Amino acid sequence: MYRMQLLSCIALSLALVTNSAPTSRSTKKTQLQLEHLLLDLQMILNGINNYKNPKLTRMLTFKFYMPKKATELKHLQCLEEELKPLEEVLNLAQSKNFHLRDTKDLISNINVIVLELKGSETTLMCEYADETATIVEFLNRWITFCQSIISTLT
């Protein structure tokens, strides 16, 4: 009789361990995706902050919307909504002295990662802050967001 309970207990324990295993793997996957997003955002920021960028002052005139609060992955919806304007500003700023390699690919990569991280079911309506941000502030805030989420996962 006790043997049957013990076997049931072992079976349930194995089921729990098996079912919980993907969670740790998905946390690792989320962390890796956030790290890739972070690197892409930093690459854009480094290209903009390059001392040889003659169009930086022009780029700073464009304003981007920032969410009032960005603390969860679902808030990446707000970043996704600003990717098209970001790409347009980066394309305007291209010159022979300043060229972000594969701007379209970078934006595409960011978009794919954002879609995977926030999930396709997210229909969050972004609540934007009253004040807008320059391209540098915009990128810095999203970089900080990624770093913050990564730190909670580790």
From Swiss-Prot:
Compartment(s): Secreted
Keywords in alphabetical order: Adaptive immunity, Cytokine, Disulfide bond, Glycoprotein, Growth factor, Immunity, Secreted, Signal
Main location: secreted
Glycosylation sites (chain numbering): 23
Disulfide cross-links: 78-126
Keyword Ion transport: no
Residues in the signal sequence: 1-20
Any one GO MF annotation of this record: cytokine activity
GO biological process: adaptive immune response
UniProt KW Glycoprotein keyword: yes
GO cellular component, as recorded: extracellular space
A matching Pfam family: IL2
Known function: Cytokine produced by activated CD4-positive helper T-cells and to a lesser extend activated CD8-positive T-cells and natural killer (NK) cells that plays pivotal roles in the immune response and tolerance. Binds to a receptor complex composed of either the high-affinity trimeric IL-2R (IL2RA/CD25, IL2RB/CD122 and IL2RG/CD132) or the low-affinity dimeric IL-2R (IL2RB and IL2RG). Interaction with the receptor leads to oligomerization and conformation changes in the IL-2R subunits resulting in downstream signaling starting with phosphorylation of JAK1 and JAK3.
Family annotation (PANTHER family): INTERLEUKIN-2
Protein family (similarity comment): Belongs to the IL-2 family.
Protein name: Interleukin-2
Gene: IL2
